[in-house]
């Protein structure tokens, strides 16, 4: 973005740029504020450049309460997107829990992963299509199996034993290097509590 980087550091989204080539940011600009700081693992994360040239990200229950581009917003636990210049923020998909995983297939469809036994969601119609009065989930879980298979015997889990308790990544197999049976049909989902 504008020759620099965007950083999520709750309560702010920041823009940094090195202008003299010394690998240090000479420009530090607050794009907007309002991200919750009550629980750091539930804040904004997993920023990715989308097919629509917006920057997409995830947030958990720490949520967002603020104003961007003259528009007041309040949301949590789902997927959002911002314009790279920070002039606009949109909440796109409501999930049911802390959201960390975010992925796209070759068509630009959006997928996500959350905590507590919800490893894969499909994000169909965005929340923005429903208007401001609509509440509720705009993403649906599509995982057919919630279990994971760690390669180490001693894992620590506190809630969803032998299942995803922290689906923290979502990468759809899109490469022609994968077998045809994988392409656009399989997602790789990390699970930190199972060392996956």
Sequence positions of predicted segments:
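Beta-propeller domains with acidic blade repeats across secreted/periplasmic ectodomains
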Residues: 1-196
